[in-house]
Amino acid sequence: VFSPQWTPQSQFAGYYVAQAKGFYKEVGLDIVIDHPSASNPALNRLREGSSHVITLQLVQAIKYIDQGIPLVNILQTSQQSSLMIVPRRKDIRTLQDLNGKKVGIWKAGFGEPAQILANRQKLDIRWIPFVSNVNLFISGAIDATLATSYNEYLQILACGIQPEHVFYLADLGYDIPEDGLYVTADYYDTHRCELQAFAEASRRGWEWAAAHPEEALTIVMEEVRRHHVGTNKVHQKRMLDNILHLQHRRNGSSPAFELSPEDVEKASDLLLDAGLIRNKITYRQITGQP
C-alpha cells in the first residue's frame, strides 16, 4: 500500500502513470494507491502499518528521524525547493517589509525553511495557519502567504491576482529539495528487493509522464474524478509542468531521482542550527546505509 501525503493531484502523477501503465505489475508488484485523510495522515498510516510507502518532504523526514522514527528514503523526486512567500499587499517589496505582518502557513507543517529564514532575519511575523487553500490570502485577511510554486501560487494567479514581488526561498539560500518516497527502516531491512523494484517502476512512471505530459494529465484527471477532488484540468496541467521542472536541479541537469549528500547535510544543518532537531541526521542514516 502506497500513500502520497495529500489528495490526488499532479504532484503524484508519476505514481498514477506507473499504476495505469502496468509498470508496477511488470516487476511483480500489486500496488494499492491509498490517499490519506485529514484525520489519519500518511505518517500515521506508515507507523501503524496500514501503508508501507509514503511521500514526505526532506525536512519532515529529517525531523521525524530525529524524533526516533527511523525512516529510509528510497527515491527522491524533488530536486529543488518550491517554497515561496507571496505578498498580498503592494507595499511588501523586501523581506524586511514582512516585519509585523500576518503570513499564512500550512497547518500540517512544510513551512519550516521560511520560519527559519524569518528568525535569522529577525522578522517579527505573525504566522496564521491555514489548511489547504488560499481563501485567507484572497480575502485580504493576511498580508502574505507561504505557497508552493506548483499549487497555491497557481491558485492565486488563477484568481486574477498578480503579486508584484514574490520571494523564492531557493533564491534566498534555502533551496531544500522536497518530495521523496519513504519507508520505515524495519520494512526497508526486510523488503529491499521489492522496494528497489517499486522505486524503479515509480521512476519509469515519472520519466513516462515527462515524455507524455498530455496523456499523464489524462491519467491524473481520472484519479481526481474518482476521488471527487475539486480542481480542474488547467490547474493540474500547470502543476504537472511545475512538478516536472522541480525534478531537475537548478543547474538544469536531468532528473537523478536520488538524494544528494550535500542536500541532506544542508537541510540537517539548517534544522539543527534552528533548534528544530537535536541530532544531525546524516546521508547514510536517511538512505539506510549501515
Task: Describe every region a protein language model picked out.
Residues 59-60, 90, 132-229:
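Pocket-lining segment of extracytoplasmic ligand-binding domains
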Residues 1-28, 262-290:
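N-terminal hydrophobic or amphipathic helices and topogenic motifs
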Residues 32-33, 40, 169-171, 234-244, ...:
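Short linear loop/turn motifs
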Residues 190-276:
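Secondary-structure end/capping motifs
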